[in-house]
Structures are given as structure tokens and as C-alpha cells.
Amino acid sequence: MKRAAMRLWTLNKGLLTHGRGLSQGSQYKISEPLHIHQVQVKLREIVGISTVWRDHVQAMEERKLLHSFLPKSQKVLPPRKIRDSYIEVLLPLGTDPELRDKYVTVQNTVRFGRILEDLDSLGVLVCYMHNHNHSTNMSLLSIVTVLVDKIDMCKHSLSPEQDIKFTGHVSWVGNTTMEVKMKMFQLHDDETYWPVLDATFVMVAQDSENKRPAFVNPLIPENKEEEELFTQGELNKSRRIAFSTSSLLKVAPSSEERNIIHELFLSTLDPKTISFQSRILPPKAVWMEDTKLKSLDICHPQERNVFNRIFGGFLMRKAYELAWATACSFGGSRPYVVTVDDIMFQKPVEVGSLLFLSSQVCFTQGNYIQVRVHSEVFSLDSREHMTTNVFHFTFMSEKEVPLIFPKTYGESMLYLDGQRHFKSMSTPVTLKKDYPVEP
């Protein structure tokens, strides 16, 4: 067993080229971006996992042997710079028709669910580059997405006829967690890249058995811009803690929120009767319970990640597509995603599980639709249902949408939670204007 561990530890060098051609400044450059297909290839090389499902048990057993090589303290790990993790990835939709078919919608736009999958893979690769050990190719760490903090869209829709470029880098590091900033750009006719999306993910490093947290390399900012990014990462952490502490699952609504719920309740009472039991809908309104949509997926090995659990990007894609269908059927027109936020990956989804998704509109305002998707799995072995994720999506409809009214106290809490997420939007009125950027 020890010999097998040493064999894994001393695999050939050079699989991961590290930040070639990076230059000083706030915009880092590399000589050539990775093709989108290379992201998964490199991840499997770094982790040392076979592409064949029947080999997964042996591969994971071999990875467990790396546990003894993990550092006992972060102090022994060399610090990294932002440039060390910076990466560019090309999605050549304009020049690859077969790839384009995978991403195109029937409305001739780009499938946002596929973009979520790419962002998840890119975020993991960025973190592996930050923690790259030059003495070996195979990483001792198992890095997974723990939180999608925020994804802000800058455009209504994307063209499937033009190339897309992703950039990403680590922006903040704790002891075992890392914040990753990613941007997405699309090529225009003038040969410049225009911004499309800003994303912030939080990743966690675990040991080779995916059981315990593992230390990651510290991050040292090189200039003022990087110091501001690092400070923002600290603020983001504090904001997440405050948001979690004030969760409606832990504390009662504020006095203002209680008044909102009471006003909603009063507006649904039937004026013809003097009763709290007789409820009617106001004009241009819909009961929250009537907006639900559900789906079921069997988690096949094809959708596994490099650690042989279900790929987080797949879960996000399925949740987004159900949320989009919910917003579309509710609003009566094609919705556009504006913001994705606060997606916490609470439990991993094992291959073979049954994945249940439940989506409903929980808040509306003007043309905006706030959709919540609850994800749970049913294990065929343990016969238990477990919540794995809660997803929050903000859509904008082409026309004004009906108001949402809760009936029960539980639905009222969903309404307030949806309102909180809506208010946290970075661009609550209109999408940002286009402007060219050279990524």
C-alpha cells in the first residue's frame, strides 16, 4: 500500500502548465487560452482518475493513500499570487458547429445551464492551479464547490454564433477555503470581447478521501487592485455569515417584514365576510402554491465529477432549467436570468441517487420573478430523503408579471426570503450596458 502511495506521489511532471506568459498589472495575459474540452481533461490528470466508470473504485482507493502526505499546517505551504491561478478558457461556438449544437437553444441563444456547468469546472481548475505542487502532477487535495455566492448577468442573451471566453483566478484564501472570481466575455463583430457575466464561487479543499478539510496555499496580493480584491473577499465572508445568522430558519422576521406579511394577508380577505378563513385573490395575482413545478432525475455515472459523485454543474443546470420553465409558465413570456445567488452545496449527491427538484415562484416585482428550487435526493440504499441544495434565481420577464400571494406561514417565510434575495441583486433595475473589454 505504501508503495502504491509513493507511485501516485511521483507521477510524471508537467501535466499542468502553470500561468504561462503572465504579466504584471490588473489584467493578466497568457499566450494561449485552454479549449473548453481541456478543462475536464486537466482535472482528471490532476486528480488521477480514470475516465472509465468501472475503474472508479480502484482509482479512489489509490487516492486515499495520499492522505499521509498532507501538510499539518498552512504555514509550511508556500504563498501564491493571483497570477499563479489565472486562467483563460475558450468556448469556440463560432468555429465549432458540433460544440455549438450542445449549447444552442431553440430560440437561437446560448443555454445558460451549460454555462453553469463550465463555470463550476473552471472554478475547480483555478483552485488546483493555485495549490499546484511543482514536484508532482497529482494533487493531494479534493477541491469541490461549496457555494455559488453570486452570478450577475450583463446581457439578456448570448449569441451561439460567436466565441466565448472565460477568465478566472483565486481572489481570497482562508485556511481551507478559496474564493474564485470568474468573468465571461463574448466576441463581437469588431473583434473585441464584451462582458457578459461576473461570478463569485467559494471552493473548499478536502483530503484525498473527501472527509476532512485540508489546508491550502496562502495568497499574497501584489498590488493595490489585488489588495482590494482580497479585502472584498473578507467582506463577502462576513456578509455571508451575517446573512446566515439572520436566516428566517433561525430568527423571526423583522417588524417591517411582519407588517408586509400582515398587509398581504389583509389584502386577501373576502370583504363580503367577516372571517379570517375566507380568502380571495386580489386582481392580477397568483397563489404561491399554484406556481410549483417538479422534476425527477436518476443520477447516472455519466454525470459524475472527478471524485465519482454527481457533478455540481449538472445539479445547477437541472435546477436552472426547472426554474426557467417555472418563470416562463408563470410570466407567460420568455424570461431572462439576471442573477444567481447563495447556492449552498450542503451534501454531495451520490451516483445512483434519485434527484427530486421542486421549483416555485416566491416573490415578484414589476417584471422580475424570484424563483426558488429545492433539491433533495433519495438514497436507494438507506431509503432516506435528504436536502442537498437550495437554488435562488432572479429572472426578468418581457412583460409585467402577476403578484404572488402566500397562503400559509411557511409560504410567507418563502416570500420574505425571496424578497431578501431580490433586494441583494447588484443590478435591480436594468441590466448593465455593454462595453468592450479585452480580457
Swiss-Prot record:
GO biological process: acyl-CoA metabolic process
Location(s) in or outside the cell: Mitochondrion
UniProt xrefs under CDD domains: BFIT_BACH
SUPFAM superfamilies on file: Thioesterase/thiol ester dehydrase-isomerase
Transit peptide: 1-21
EC class name: hydrolase
Highest taxon of source: Eukaryota
Main subcellular localisation: mitochondrion
GO MF entry, a single one: carboxylic ester hydrolase activity
Enzyme Commission number: 3.1.2.-
Keyword line: Hydrolase, Mitochondrion, Repeat, Serine esterase, Transit peptide
Domain HotDog ACOT-type: 85-209, 289-401
Coiled coil: none
GO-annotated cellular components: mitochondrion
InterPro entries: HOTDOG_ACOT (IPR033120), HotDog_dom_sf (IPR029069)
Transmembrane segments: none
UniProt record similarity statement: Belongs to the acyl coenzyme A hydrolase family.
Function: Catalyzes the hydrolysis of acyl-CoAs into free fatty acids and coenzyme A (CoASH), regulating their respective intracellular levels. Active on long chain acyl-CoAs.
Name of the protein in question: Acyl-coenzyme A thioesterase 10, mitochondrial
Organism: Mus musculus
